[in-house]
Amino acid sequence: MTISILLAQQIAQLFLMIFMGFLIVKAGLLKDEDSKVLSKIVLYLIIPCVILNAFQVDYTPETVRGLLVAFAASLLMQVVLLFAVSALGRVFHLDAVEITSVYYSNSGNLIVPLVTAVLGTEWVLYSCVYMSVQLVFFWTHCKKVISREASYDWKKIVLNLNIISIFVGILLFFTGIRLPALVNNTLHSVGSMVGPASMIVTGMLFAGMDFRQIFANKRIYFVTFLRLIAVPLMALVLLKISHLADLSADGPTLILIVFLAVITPSASTVTQMCQVYGNDSRYASAINVVTTLASIVTMPLLVMLLQMVL
């Protein structure tokens, strides 16, 4: 019950951040299209800082085992759910924005502050495992779908700052190299902006939308159902039958972290990707807002269901 209450509080905070972005546009201080600059800052600066900072922990056998369990669970979720969502896309004729909004969760913005508040900072590393795995898919699958590219540009993928940050973070962890306190504190400070900055972008885009048109669009409610109900239930079944929680003394907590990452609203980074590559960013933002609103109810209930099942 404590986790469920903290979840609701964290999501409520995200809505206040969205409202701030909304107000700054409605007040005439900025235009909704100005959010594109902030989107690039989030994608190429703030998220890499989150990743690098998360891997600055001591190397121990227990930590490595926990990382392997979290990685296995995260990879299982990403691979199986990708096939499942792709199948749903063909059956229900989902477009590029809808497919990516259903598949990609808002783990980067919500899971880190949530895990910090509920479990403590020592567990943030494991939440970043899921985020790192998702980022690889995000900069390959999502980028290809949103940008409508015919093939993968592997050179751009490998040289992407987010992918580089993942490999550098892993290297620093396994070699035991610790960054100077000044650098690490800077990474932490910049990384802590990921939630507020992403939500402000969403609010700025939302301010330029027609509210009646958004909530009159029945497709949004169906996409919300897929993102917050169908996908989480599939994930719950996968985690249950995989028995990954039995592989570590901290297994149940690690599985909880991965499940939390899966059941979050649609990724705000999909909106940012749409902005950067010229897809329908307003529709993506509308899906993000509606799923975030609905997740106030769905996330606490799903966590309670997980605790009953495991």
What do these predicted regions represent?
Residues 1-310:
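Alpha-helical transmembrane segments of multi-pass small-molecule/ion transporters
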